[in-house]
Amino acid sequence: MTRRLYPARLTGTVAAPPSKSAWHRELICRFLAGQPLPQELSGADVSATLSGLRVLRQGGDAIDCGASGATLRFLLPLAMALGRTGLHLTGTPRLLERPLSAPYPVARENAGYRITEPLTPGRYALRGDETSQTVSGLLMALPLLAEPSELVLTTPLVSRAYVDMTLDALRRHGVTVLTTETGWRIPAPPVFQPD
């Protein structure tokens, strides 16, 4: 088959899909605002987050994080803030070798983590030179609690752009997080709103 192409001036705009990092945060904020979630997404990491959010919405007892560190580090504190004690988060052996970098009340069992207590309001101290995903996970989970909390960095933050991406997603969904000299203060309980 032969096709002829003729020169033409093209106009319009193309919406580029968000990055994987932005999608994780957007999905979580949509979930917390009570918005519908997409049916499916391309990419194993964001698909793991989408599946995990469905488990949280529908009341399942386990979340498979696959190989996604972001899914584990974002959904673990979120599930704790939602009071999902007993929930089991699993993943690939390689994922589960990586540290959580936060003192969460979880039990290590059956190739994963089981939540033993809910997340409570308070002061959380984290190292800023480890993964920013732990910081972002807490920034998205702490607004769900009934009282204010504080997130303090004990070392300088190395991945500020990812934390800024989280703060931007929260702002777009109606949640204000206050920046302090050493971290953030999270007033509670704000209400997540549709973007």
Placement of each model-derived feature along the sequence:
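Structural preference for solvent-exposed beta-strand-turn elements
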Residues: 1-195
